[in-house]
Swiss-Prot record:
Residues where lipid is bound covalently (S-palmitoyl cysteine): C333
Assembly behavior: May form homooligomers. Forms a heterodimer with OPRM1. Interacts with GPRASP1. Interacts with RTP4; the interaction promotes cell surface localization of the OPRD1-OPRM1 heterodimer.
Keyword RNA-binding attached: no
SUPFAM superfamilies listed in its UniProt record: Family A G protein-coupled receptor-like
Primary localization: membrane
Modification after translation, per record: Ubiquitinated. A basal ubiquitination seems not to be related to degradation. Ubiquitination is increased upon formation of OPRM1:OPRD1 oligomers leading to proteasomal degradation; the ubiquitination is diminished by RTP4.
Entry's family note: Belongs to the G-protein coupled receptor 1 family.
Tissue: Detected in brain, brain stem and brain cortex.
Entry protein name: Delta-type opioid receptor
Length: 372
């Protein structure tokens, strides 16, 4: 095993968390400091570090609070335990873990060194990869789930159950461990230019495995899942255009179409937030560009921040696009103040395995939420 050479190690793809090990040398004025002392950084370097820290702080606050509320709501309220929402729970768990690493990364940007030791280095880098793969795998399964619900409603009665969704979520984490565990093993801390960096130590030849890793991540954590999602929604679009009533009930059809749109919006947000960093990594790896150009470095960190921002965006999308989550969020906010109506969220009647259209509602009227 040998560390990735400096020319190749400047950009590790753990949501590029360890890309900031090059941050002190990214600007010529900062790299001119022979001692590598963090105190002699340029004004532009300091300004970028402060901007990144402010952005990460906002993303961390919104992402942690929002995703914890989503998970708590799904666990607490029986009517939210639907197949679609079980997948959403998995997505929220991955997002919450990713946003929990941001305080450590903000400190790294400000201090120009990794002060937290090798154990946290392994945890942070592996969490980034887990988030990347579990998120896109979960979104892919959500799209397949919607395809089955829309195009094969009879089969959906057996396939789309909370129990099977939980089993699929476990399989997603096991599959993601095929990447996350090796990253945890390869993550190390190393001294560099008077500071400590948290980076990946690939086997020899390190440049080869570094390049292979980035290309495989681009293919299997972005291109292939997006192709599957595109096919699923293309088939759904044809079905929705050719059939006026999917379920024989206008009310159920409205719910089905509404939740299909919500999943599509969440997938679209993921693509918009993650496409820039995936493309940037491939360009950075395969094209000879000036990696010390301040504009290139600023664009890189903007792409990284955009990827993290997706983790805080999802709970906002659920709240705006899904009436059930909106009602449950309101109930959760009112509960500490004693504003919750007794029995309004938990109904004595037995829940069915299939998803329904009501959740967290004071009556048995249509809730129009995520349970279609």
């Amino acid at each position: 095993m040998e560390p990735v050479p400096s020319a190749r190690a400047e950009l590790q793809f753990s949501l590029l968390a360890n890309v900031s090990d090059t941050f002190p040398s990214a600007f010529p004025s900062a790299s001119a400091n022979a001692s590598g002392s963090p105190g002699a950084r340029s004004a532009s370097s300091l300004a970028l570090a402060i901007a990144i820290t402010a952005l990460y702080s906002a993303v961390c606050a919104v992402g942690l609070l929002g995703n914890v509320l989503v998970m708590f709501g799904i666990v607490r309220y029986t009517k939210l335990k639907t197949a679609t929402n079980i997948y959403i729970f998995n997505l929220a768990l991955a997002d919450a873990l990713a946003t929990s690493t941001l305080p450590f990364q903000s400190a790294k940007y400000l201090m120009e060194t990794w002060p937290f030791g090798e154990l946290l280095c392994k945890a942070v880098l592996s969490i980034d990869y887990y988030n990347m793969f579990t998120s896109i795998f979960t979104l892919t399964m959500m799209s397949v789930d919607r395809y089955i619900a829309v195009c094969h409603p009879v089969k959906a009665l057996d396939f789309r159950t909370p129990a099977k969704a939980k089993l699929i979520n476990i399989c997603i984490w096991v599959l993601a461990s095929g990447v996350g565990v090796p990253i945890m093993v390869m993550a190390v801390t190393q001294p560099r230019d008077g500071a400590v960096v948290c980076t990946l130590q690939f086997p020899s030849p390190s440049w080869y495995w570094d390049t292979v890793t980035k290309i495989c991540v681009f293919l299997f954590a972005f291109v292939v899942p997006i192709l599957i999602i595109t096919v699923c929604y293309g088939l759904m679009l044809l079905r929705l255009r050719s059939v006026r009533l999917l379920s024989g009930s206008k009310e159920k059809d409205r719910s089905l179409r509404r939740i299909t749109r919500m999943v599509l919006v969440v997938v679209g947000a993921f693509v918009v937030c993650w496409a820039p960093i995936h493309i940037f990594v491939i360009v950075w790896t395969l094209v000879d560009i000036n990696r010390r150009d301040p504009l290139v470095v600023a664009a890189l960190h903007l792409c990284i921040a955009l990827g993290y921002a997706n983790s805080s965006l999802n709970p906002v999308l659920y709240a705006f696009l899904d009436e059930n989550f909106k009602r449950c969020f309101r109930q959760l906010c009112r509960a500490p103040c004693g504003g919750q109506e007794p029995g309004s969220l938990r109904r004595p009647r037995q829940a069915t395995a299939r998803e329904r259209v009501t959740a967290c509602t004071p009556s048995d009227g249509p809730g129009g939420g995520a349970a279609a």
